[in-house]
Amino acid sequence: MAVAAKNIPAPDLVPVRRALLSVFDKTGLIDFARALAAAGVELVSTGGTAKAIAEAGLAVRDVSELTGFPEIMDGRVKTLHPSVHGALLGVRDDPEHAAAMRKYGIEPIDLLVSNLYPFEEVRRSGADYAAIVENIDIGGPAMIRASAKNHAYVAIVTDPGDYASVLNALEMNIGSLSLDFRKKLAAKAFARTATYDAAISGWFAEALEIEHPTWRAFGGRLTEVMRYGENPHQSAGFYVNGDKRPGVATARQLQGKQLSYNNINDTDAAFELAGEFDPSRSAAVAIIKHANPCGVAEGTSLKSAYAKALACDPVSAFGGIVAVNRTLDAEAAEDIVKTFTEVIIAPDATDEAAAIVAAKKNLRLLVTGGLPDPRSPGTTVKSVAGGLLVQGRDNAVVDDLELKVVTKRAPTPAEMADLKFAFRVAKHVKSNAIVYAKDGATVGIGAGQMSRVDSSRIAARKALDAAEAAGMTEPLTTGSVVASDAFFPFADGLLAAVAAGATAVIQPGGSMNDKDVIAAADEHGIAMVFTGVRHFRH
């Protein structure tokens, strides 16, 4: 049975006469406190916050004056007291509440200013277990939730970014705050404590290796409201969750227009693919369109890798995203800007490269400070009607797999290098995925088809188109290798690769018809390798 409500109407304007300030992040605190004091608001505070306010020459009461109880246990207990929570939770127009406040000498608090111990930052810093636990705030969330619940009478400010709007509202309403304004502050406060608790519960699950906890929460902070989502009739916002994995969420944008929803989605896909390639071994470039690769290549330089990647599908590359695995240099930048590109993302960029990109004022340039580790664990989340699908990140890397040659002919060393390259790329292509590759570059990519053989045929067709556009007399797939993200259920997919001129195949294996597919490969002198790992991507 639910708790019954008394349905006491909330006042519109509530005068702010007393404020309790208890913050860890003291950004803007003194100016805000000074403005409140100038408006005649009595300041009450705790610990380090009270000290900072007093040192600024402002009159402030320590919270212990309200509670009659000192701060104890290394500051763990400061505000967990009826005199504080009664002051925040009391319904002023409820006669019983008002009588209790008078009886116990509880002085009402009209404004709470509170932000929390930096749990998320301490967790990301690699601190030990005890330090992380010590940075779980208890009193702060308790006060925030109390104030937010009682927004009928109390305003709660959790973000220093809101100080100016609070002062403006107080000035506009002659020392009061409106109910609508208090509701908005309360909504933000509950979102903040929910996000905070989500981070804590997520850390515990990770620390205790609980793969699928009974209850799971996901939190994030809004960084921007976008013009629209995937389509103009859809609204969109970008939230970051504090994960420091190098990528679009952690990048610095050096120049260019605001990123769109589709830009962010495609840029994430591009950089995750670039992260598959060790920069100490080779330069690598990935060109992405609609979250699918349209060209990927390795080279001795970013310039050479970009040229090879672009040659795979120059038509689709128009308006695409370019991701690189090394510092963007001037030579590569000069070539990239010749084709209309939406975003370039790189671990870093030289000043010369940045200047070249700056000539294209709308082209976004992002630098991340590093590459995403393809082997690191993580979580992916997809919303479905009424729920969430949660799974571990696909962190299988072909170099770590036990590859099995299943045909009479084994791949040559050059073929094996290309097979591994192609399988890396196939991991990032929407299923059904087929990737043709030669000499460390994709030459044909088939993505997103319901039939694997159709993906194979499309990849071969695109390779033929690219060859014709380049004035070549034979298809790019001649002498190539082919990777499939999942097994060939029948020999037809492999035979399509044979028809395109492929000489070797890499695929997970595991079909009931593996023997037929292997026999077809042997019949045509094709070398085939099984990985034992599938890379479906939807």
From Swiss-Prot:
Species of the source: Mesorhizobium japonicum (strain LMG 29417 / CECT 9101 / MAFF 303099)
Pathway per the UniProt entry: Purine metabolism; IMP biosynthesis via de novo pathway; 5-formamido-1-(5-phospho-D-ribosyl)imidazole-4-carboxamide from 5-amino-1-(5-phospho-D-ribosyl)imidazole-4-carboxamide (10-formyl THF route): step 1/1; Purine metabolism; IMP biosynthesis via de novo pathway; IMP from 5-formamido-1-(5-phospho-D-ribosyl)imidazole-4-carboxamide: step 1/1
Gene3D superfamilies reported in the protein's UniProt record: 3.40.140.20, Methylglyoxal synthase-like domain (3.40.50.1380)
Domain-level remarks: The IMP cyclohydrolase activity resides in the N-terminal region.
Lineage, top ranks: Bacteria, Pseudomonadati, Pseudomonadota, Alphaproteobacteria, Hyphomicrobiales
HAMAP family per UniProt: PurH
UniProt protein name: Bifunctional purine biosynthesis protein PurH
Entries under InterPro entries matching the protein: AICAR_Tfase_dup_dom_sf, Cytidine_deaminase-like, MGS-like_dom, MGS-like_dom_sf, PurH-like
GO cellular component: cytosol
Lineage top rank: taxon: Bacteria
